[in-house]
Amino acid sequence: MTPKARLLTEQRRRNVLDLVDQDGQVTVVDMVRRFSISAVTVRNDLDALASIGAVVRSHGGAVRRLEATQDYPLRTKEALHRDEKIKIGRAAAELVRPGETIILDSGTTTAEVARHLKRMRMQSLTVITNALNIAVELADIPGITLIMIGGLLRPVSCSFVGPQAEAMMNEFHADRLFLAVDGFDLENGLSTPDVLEAQLNNVMIRSAKEVNVVTDFSKLGRRSVSKIGPLDKIRRLITDNRATQEFTEALRKKGIEVIEV
């Protein structure tokens, strides 16, 4: 590449970064139109920016890099690691048996669990959730009894939290919990940006016979602000195959089953 071409490439990538910072995300289609370049060139730019940690590649584009300590809207999270979340959701749903009662925590990965359960058409299943988007997914599915946990609405996650939600959750027992987290640290356990969400998650853990954490590789080894609980309550982690061997082996040594998809 000539010095002039390199300069143009660097300037274009800086412009892409500015757009990501401004809008939260960019798409390949939009970048092709905006910069009058090929889709291949756009993908190369996004891959280069992702390789240095400046952005995170998403389906059809890239999004702003998220920090575990910050709380992001559901739509922003939905664009991240979508393929991995779909696979994780499928693997989690396949663990569920007819007649069970399960808890689905709020989150984009647990929403994928709900979508796969929807397609499975079980004859008898009870689902407890505090997430509006998950409730909408499952509300009219024959064979599914839906219990909605109410309380204080968190618009950023479309979920209910707070003392009322905790009190209601305390009234139930479940066979399995599927819990999505923002941080999964070997030393400090599970965590999330919001303290009220962390408190409700802790009640969910106590209410379930089996705790399954569903999260993609990007949350592993990270720590957020509000601690949910230690690792000793976790039966299983369902994640994608980009999780590091060091992390998964450390969990297995602690007696936690790891499913990688």
What are these regions (language model features)?
Residues 126-127, 176:
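A residue-level structural signature of the nucleotidyltransferase/glycosyltransferase Rossmann-like core
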